[in-house]
Amino acid sequence: QLLALVVAKERPDLDEEKSSLVIKNSKSKRRLLEIQAKMLGLLENTDPNKLLDDLELIKTLTESNQTSQSIQQQLVESEETERNIDESRQKYRGVACRGSLLFFCISNLFQVDPMYQYSLAWYINFFGICIDNTPASDDLETRIQSLIDTSTVNFYNNICRSLFERHKQMFAFLLCCRIMQGEGEIDAREYRFLITGPSRLIEQGENPAPQWLNSKSWYEIKALNTLPSFDGLQESFTKNISEWKEIFDASDASKLQFPDGWDRKLTQFQKLLILRAFRPDSVPSGIQDLILKRLGPQFIEAPQFDLSSSFDDSSVTTPLLFVLSVGADPASDLAKFAEKKSFSKKFSSMSLGQGQGEIAAKKMAEAMDRGHWLMLQNCHLAVSWLPELEVLIEKIKPDEVNRDFRLWLTSMPSP
């Protein structure tokens, strides 16, 4: 689906040609079947003994056969053309794959917080806008890389606007890992170890440094030793206790080189597993370094909330939802923004609560008709009415609503 979207925007000529070919081939195949059926019908209804004497029949069969061969040749040529079109389409597969990867980064975010839910329809529209806003280039390879980079940065910035501050680095790390996994840079077992720890029981064994290394850390080092890339780690640790203790005692263990050649043996991602084992407090710093190296500085500092950018993402059918934290009230900021947009006299708000649904629906209908902005506050206080609000939004027909209409919603986090 995303490949079709990318090609439709980047090479509409290919899209049109392929659609035309499909229709043409379908007609040709149907015509071929009709000719074959006609030839069989003529042969079945002709006396075999008079077959060679029926000049009209022979002429008809000859013409039908020639037409059939011509159609078959056209089909062969069409199939070759279709293969060439598909080859050209495949050049954009990398963009579509990145688009798919990005969507699956957010498909399970609701497990982190139920408020983090994103529809496929929203994402496809967003991805299309990213394509439209990517700087043009005459060189195809440059253009494709630009599409991948622009969509990734815009995706990160857009999603970060909808996340609580405490979840932003986690999301950047998830995005980084998904990209690395897609390019074969992360082993699945190593990823599981980093996220969940040892997956099977192993013998505890004697801790070589019980004075400063706790039993849990030693157990994880032994578990790491069972992974192919970490084979020999346990022995190295035992033989180089003093060097490893320097790492353990450092204020930020992620900034030091691991002893006994392990710094060279391991990738930056794999080093996080060692940090998890005996300096878990340094993992966030190590994650930040990985993100910086793999994705770039724009993924380290999450963008500050920008009401103007959020407004640009909205439409008559796409309301904006402010998820509130304790003490936060976006109403004043929105009022200032309305003034900046010369909408002060076209902006109204109301607080939802028991029995307010009918009034809110009426105000919404008026705002849609007049092209006003309506802010419905405290949606969490009208949970029973929200399904009706959802239906009202889904029923909005863009062509029948004033294009200046916007709906703003506020709610406390709710499961």
Each model region followed by its residue ranges:
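Amphipathic alpha-helical coiled-coil
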Residues: Q1-S414
